[in-house]
Amino acid sequence: MFSQLQPVATDPILGLMAAYKEDPNPLKVDLGVGVYKDEQGHTAVLDCVKKAEKLRLDHEDSKTYIGMAGDLSFNRHIEQLAFGPHKVLLEGRVTTAHTPGGTGALRVAAEFIKKANPDATIWVTSPTWANHISLFQAAGLKVKEYSYYDYSTKGLNEEAM
């Protein structure tokens, strides 16, 4: 069943992570994947996250399936956090759904976009994560890239954006 699968391209960010681990320089700084790490390189669980998890577990009374959109109460609170009293919320023009992480969110969005507009084109930054382009293409979307970084000035390329 899997004999026809081809290896995917390596992710340059993951390659940087491997090089970082091998670098003996004690002053190195990991700017690869966007997670907080302490001085020992450990990705700590922040106290506020532990408290939120405990609060959630203490009040959870069921493991029943909650539906495709996830926890609707959580969704409404996230919408209020993201948009505040913006008219798009008041007019009911926002829809929120839980996803299994960032890549899962992109895939769900890609499938939704393809269904809503089969001719849609997705624009991704260049550079982007290695899986982003193939993820959108696998959903049947056209993908184009735009630059956001100006290597000569080491700043944003606002004209390209």
Language-model features: locations:
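Short, basic, glycine/proline-bearing loop/turn elements
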Residues: 1-5, 146-149
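N-terminal "arm"/small-domain region of PLP-dependent enzymes with the aminotransferase-like
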Residues: 2-66, 77-80, 84
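Conserved core of the PLP fold type I
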Residues: 55, 60-161
